[in-house]
């Protein structure tokens, strides 16, 4: 009998290949969750899957996906249904960040950032929130940012996308509560965190953030 036939709960984590997503996956596996790992890099996902299987003896499903692509959210949802995976906890962590003057940055890259940070998150939430509400239980955690609370020059599209995530999540949480759906919806707003997103000299270094202000994923 496979592990997915047990009473273990299952979490789906996007952006799971490194940083906050990988840390969430590790913590959840340690709490005896089976984990569905979603990100672009299949090799990194397989490495994480092997690690979690060895450490915690949980079942990991690897789903490589580029969430900036049209219909990526629907394809992800359909795969979970085809595999009979019941998602109890959804963590929308996948995100992109590009720094620089708005008019200097490539428009296609900014549109891709919106596709991942806003459109994919909205679509994935819609698909899984519906099925969770039908079951009468489930949890959704959307990763926003402290950037959601302010206008940030050189990060205007990123900050705006995270403001959307925060506002959307707060409103959806109220809807789910008012409808007695049994589904909890929460936004997490971390500060600047030492991940690969911030390691890129064109990203984190440009912000001139003192090392003492950086958070670490385990925090």
Stretches with model-predicted labels:
Residues 174-219:
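SDR active-site lid
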Residues 42-43, 64-75, 107:
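The beta1-alpha1 cofactor-binding region of Rossmann-like NAD(H)/NADP(H)-dependent oxidoreductases
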Residues 101-102, 109-112:
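Substrate-binding pocket helix/loop in short-chain dehydrogenase/reductase
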Residues 125, 161:
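Active-site helix of classical SDR
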Residues 31-48:
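Conserved glycine-rich Rossmann-like NAD(P)H-binding loop of the short-chain dehydrogenase/reductase
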Residues 145:
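Residue(s) in the substrate-gating loop at a strand-loop-helix junction
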Residues 17-18:
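Conserved glycine-rich cofactor-binding loop
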């Amino acid at each position: 009998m496979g592990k997915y036939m047990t009473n273990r709960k299952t979490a789906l984590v996007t952006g799971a290949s490194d940083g906050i997503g990988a840390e969430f996956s590790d913590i959840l596996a340690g709490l005896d969750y089976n984990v569905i790992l979603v990100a672009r890099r299949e090799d990194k996902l397989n490495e994480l899957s092997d690690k979690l299987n060895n450490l915690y003896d949980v079942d990991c499903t690897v789903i490589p996906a580029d969430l900036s692509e049209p219909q990526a959210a629907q394809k992800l949802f359909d795969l979970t249904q085809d595999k009979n995976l019941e998602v109890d906890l959804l963590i929308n962590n996948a995100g992109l960040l590009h720094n620089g003057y708005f008019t200097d940055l490539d428009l296609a890259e900014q549109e891709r950032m919106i596709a991942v940070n806003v459109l994919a998150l909205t679509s994935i939430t819609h698909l899984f929130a519906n099925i969770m509400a039908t079951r009468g239980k489930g949890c959704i955690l959307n990763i926003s940012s402290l950037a959601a609370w302010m206008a940030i020059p050189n990060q205007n599209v990123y900050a705006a996308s995270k403001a959307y995530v925060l506002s959307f999540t707060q409103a959806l949480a109220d809807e789910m509560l008012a409808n007695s759906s049994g589904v909890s919806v929460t936004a997490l707003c971390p500060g600047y965190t030492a991940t690969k997103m911030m390691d890129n000299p064109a990203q984190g270094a440009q912000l001139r953030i003192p090392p003492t202000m950086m958070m670490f994923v385990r925090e």
